[in-house]
Curated annotation (Swiss-Prot):
Subcellular location: Cytoplasm
UniProt protein name: Segregation and condensation protein A
Sequence similarity: Belongs to the ScpA family.
Keyword NADP: no
Organism listed in the record: Bacillus cytotoxicus (strain DSM 22905 / CIP 110041 / 391-98 / NVH 391-98)
């Protein structure tokens, strides 16, 4: 069975690269191209495996990374001497680095504008009340924002776990389950368990095809805001909860 699924929340290859740089605490001014290329291609492979609609710009960036990687492997040659008299070594990463820095600035400005818009929406004609202490305490306890890239990383990790635990002689039974049915199953399971469950526990004892459908169902539930995804810190376990429970 084919599951064609388009994820509109992906913002593009630069967004994915920034996610990887943040996730693995990479210096944006000194990008380890081999490492970042491997991680990037791994995400693309997972997206294709899940039959997500991967835009051509992702593939163009993959080709760009591979080209930069190959240039980095070549012996470095001294280029023309600048007016200052200093030798200049051309860095194949320079253009990509500049694009990432500019995109990061754009994202920061966009986030600030959104925050100001939200603050503006909370203004009333009544005298102002100082909520500073409450807001600081609340912010300290807020979980991280979980992106679709975080979900892909969690799915990759889970698939590796399953592969390492699966017996060599295991036979996969093909099961065809509609995504809509799996969405209903997940919501019912969350309700039964008090509205919250670990991401990995949802995939217990499932075969590969069912795992794929389960993951796509989770993405659909996220898109329709029927579930909330939480993660306390980077690389921590991800938890799912029903949106109606979370709002209570």
């Amino acid at each position: 069975m084919q599951y064609n699924f388009k994820v509109e929340s992906f913002e593009g290859p630069l967004d994915l690269l920034l996610h990887l740089i943040h996730r693995y605490e990479i210096d944006i001014y000194n990008i380890p191209v081999a490492e970042i290329t491997e991680q990037y291609l791994s995400y693309i492979h997972t997206m294709k495996e899940l039959q997500l609609d991967v835009a051509s710009e992702y593939l163009v960036m993959a080709a760009t990374l591979l080209q930069i990687k190959s240039k980095m492997l070549l012996p470095k040659q001294e280029e023309d001497v600048h007016d200052s008299g200093e030798d200049f070594i051309d860095d194949p990463r320079q253009e990509l680095m500049e694009r990432l820095i500019e995109y990061k600035k754009y994202k920061q400005v966009a986030a600030e504008l959104k925050e100001r818009e939200q603050e503006r929406a909370q203004l009333y004609t009544r005298p102002p009340i100082d909520f500073t202490s409450f807001q600081q305490e609340e912010a300290a306890n807020l979980p991280l924002d979980v992106t679709l890239y975080d979900m892909l990383a969690a799915f990759q990790k889970m698939m590796r776990r399953k592969k390492s635990k699966r017996p060599v002689t295991a036979r996969i039974t093909r099961q065809e389950i509609p995504i809509e049915q799996r969405m209903t199953d997940i919501l019912q399971k969350l309700e039964t368990l008090g509205g919250r469950q670990s991401f990995y526990d949802l995939f217990a004892d499932e075969e590969r095809e069912v795992m794929v459908v389960t993951f796509l169902a989770i993405l659909e539930l996220m898109k329709h805001q029927q579930i909330v995804i939480e993660q306390e810190q980077n690389f921590d376990e991800i938890f799912l909860s029903c949106a109606n429970h979370n709002s209570k």
